[in-house]
Amino acid sequence: MVESRRAAAAASAYASRCGIAPATSQRSLATPPTISVPSGEGRCRCHVARGAGRDPRRRLRRRRWCGRCGYHSHLTGGEFDVNRLCQQRSRERSCQLVAVPADPRPKRQRITDVLTLALVGFLGGLITGISPCILPVLPVIFFSGAQSVDAAQVAKPEGAVAVRRKRALSATLRPYRVIGGLVLSFGMVTLLGSALLSVLHLPQDAIRWAALVALVAIGAGLIFPRFEQLLEKPFSRIPQKQIVTRSNGFGLGLALGVLYVPCAGPILAAIVVAGATATIGLGTVVLTATFALGAALPLLFFALAGQRIAERVGAFRRRQREIRIATGSVTILLAVALVFDLPAALQRAIPDYTASLQQQISTGTEIREQLNLGGIVNAQNAQLSNCSDGAAQLESCGTAPDLKGITGWLNTPGNKPIDLKSLRGKVVLIDFWAYSCINCQRAIPHVVGWYQAYKDSGLAVIGVHTPEYAFEKVPGNVAKGAANLGISYPIALDNNYATWTNYRNRYWPAEYLIDATGTVRHIKFGEGDYNVTETLVRQLLNDAKPGVKLPQPSSTTTPDLTPRAALTPETYFGVGKVVNYGGGGAYDEGSAVFDYPPSLAANSFALRGRWALDYQGATSDGNDAAIKLNYHAKDVYIVVGGTGTLTVVRDGKPATLPISGPPTTHQVVAGDRLASETLEVRPSKGLQVFSFTYG
């Protein structure tokens, strides 16, 4: 009887989680309960909890496991054995089924897409590997191969033959170890470096500086044997078979791989953005791995060439000490040159003969779609797919996901955290925003108006601040931006994109409307449709407290400033985000001198003078630095930070704005109608420009 009840309970759990009906309510385990699944394919994941009866058929083979008990099965129309869908393992457990939307692509198509990404990544890496960006590291790669004969040739004829053979093998493998270390660090740092630094609250260039220090140390060890012994001393207590020292080349490759990251082309720039926003999936990993492999093959060719020359030319074999000193000197010179960004001048002097090839293979629709994965689907957020963007009626999209990984709170008593479960009984609006985002600045007056109008009627608002730029991670900057926008409701600081990812968000702004039972009922991405959102808020408030007296809708008094015509897309100056650069030459990280092109395409920008570019924005590095912008809009805003002045030239008339303090938004054009125009912005030296936005 107990077992029968447990079976029935399991069937009910499946039904409630997957939205399907049990075919029977009570059966013994000898005749397991079944569940009817609607026609069409879906997916269910089984997660387990302790305390239920064993399944006598748990040893059935040909099962796929995931999660903790974790049977993972595709379901199609028909009846399915509950116990076989979620087999028990070794302990007594009960299972619950969580519905997960199926990938609509056929299996063959999914495999084809991954193979396409692999091919595109490999070709993109190969093109990068033969581009001018490899020139700064070529001497070190070449000499690392030439030095590989050291261990084999210096070994004395007397002594154990096995030792000489081991040294010869190590010498032969040295070029492969150098390139292997480069591929590993190149891929890992590019994919995970930004996220790791954000988690550790370290500067975004911390890994690069660590690699420069390591490069200098390796070079000094090659020149001074006593210093090399000091470097290896901390590893002396480790069993020799486990030591991976500088001499085998792997450490040198690790350092070079970090410093090789700025050479990445458009594909790796997209991967950097994916890594920073925690959208790392199979496609991103495959693209990164194949890109790193493709980029490393030309370098391996040069390393092996150095090795072959050293083996065949007697002078190399007789002067191994001099070769070590030369290798160390070149390594240190490379590190010093990278500190002062000298290789950038060499890269600018030589035309990038591979730029057009990289653009051709990186602009495909498939790649863009697969890198923009829409967040990681998990048991908490799977049912968000049931909501359509901006629907005019309430929908049911599952229990609201948790506010994960929040690094701090503002506008709460003592800045203490808020748990969504504590707000049950209230209608909750989750608003994703960033204080320098002009789209958010246009939307937030409506959110503030709703909060002021309905907070006494049962509405709670939480603003989840997910930074678009590094400076937006500073709590003081967020607090100042919130005060300027009149925000008094609680703010959750989502600096690590954890909540952003858990809600599968991709937009600034975005609203998630949650009813009094904790269920997501409406999702709106972007600006506009404020009257629809407010109508649904009022409907949920009435559902939570029938007969509640509500004030007049605030949308009648707050103007809707959402642009209705097609405007120039938001213009980013960060190396990893730039999409509409219309100037000549490469737009790469580092300091460079630019000039305007003879003509500037619509909805694009160009630079003039000396600029220092990074993944956040562009910093004026000279007194002649300027930006020319061809835009289509009524209003133009610029996000800029630092101390100095910003001169805006429009229709030949200059206007100067004083700039002081952390980066924030400044309006540079306030037009009276939508128009296509060109303007020039001249920031004083030291100002950092992040983006243009339009209204």
UniProtKB/Swiss-Prot annotation:
Keyword presence, Disulfide bond: no
One annotated GO biological process: cytochrome complex assembly
Membrane topology: Multi-pass membrane protein
Subcellular location: Cell membrane
InterPro entries reported in the protein's UniProt record: AhpC/TSA, Cyt_c_assmbl_TM_dom, Thioredoxin-like_sf, Thioredoxin_10, Thioredoxin_domain, Thioredoxin_ResA/DsbE_sf
GO cellular component: plasma membrane
Domain of life: Bacteria
GO molecular function: antioxidant activity; oxidoreductase activity
Residue ranges annotated for the Thioredoxin domain, each copy included: 394-542
Membrane-crossing residue ranges in chain numbering: 123-143, 179-199, 205-225, 254-274, 285-305, 325-345
Alphabetized Pfam families for the sequence: AhpC-TSA, DsbD_TM, Thioredoxin_10
Keywords assigned by UniProt, alphabetized: Cell membrane, Membrane, Transmembrane, Transmembrane helix
Protein name, entry field: Protein DipZ
Organism: Mycobacterium bovis (strain ATCC BAA-935 / AF2122/97)
